[in-house]
Amino acid sequence: MRFIKTISVVLITLVIVFVIGCKKEKNNVTGVVVEHHEYVDLGLPSGTLWAKCNIGADNPEDFGDYFAWGETKTKDVYDWKQYKYSVFEEDSYKLNKYCTDPSCGVGGFVDNLTVLESGDDVARAEWGENWRMPTSEEFNELYQNTTFVWTEINGVYGRLLTGSNGNSIFMPATGFRLDDQLICTGLGVYWSSSLQTDCQVAAWSLHFDDVNCHVCGTYERSRGQVVRAVSNNRP
């Protein structure tokens, strides 16, 4: 009888260890949920956690929704006339927010804001206060501390980013929206929250194709691009 009790205790212990081990392995593969959305820990130096999917997407390979920089709603047309922070003055569109250069602002307007405020951050607006858009510095960290492999998932091309800990995220080549068209779907173009201060009409983006990958500051704020959210909050 004592032997049977001992065997039972051992078996129960093994079952507990096995179940705990499975749960841990599952988290490594699928990510961890924060406010109903999954993040993946890529082992980055800053500890920044990257979302598994784009804003508006259900799966990693889905493109998701497109937003002008600093806007939190989708729309049918992406141009300067429809852009939230532009006003037509004399013969060109001028900025009325996120401007450090008087020559670019309406009537010489400047506010010296160079990073999106929380109310203009679509990741926070859509997913809650524990999520936000990445900065240009965080895109650089991502690029420098992961392998970027061009691949295909379920017929969608993009980059598989793998961190030093073996965890990965997939970022599809989404293209961008200009006027009422989706164009350049062989490119991945993802907004950061950082203004391009040398060119006020643009903001920094992660840009990649099947050959190159870099952080680019030439994409105009009025065009529609996708967003991959980040978090610094571990459950």
Regions found by a protein language model. Name each.
Residues 1-11:
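Bacterial N-terminal signal peptides that target proteins for export
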Residues 18-21:
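C-terminal motif of bacterial Sec signal peptides marking the signal peptidase cleavage site
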Residues 23-25:
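Bacterial signal peptide processing site
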Residues 28-235:
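Conserved positions within compact, well-structured domain cores
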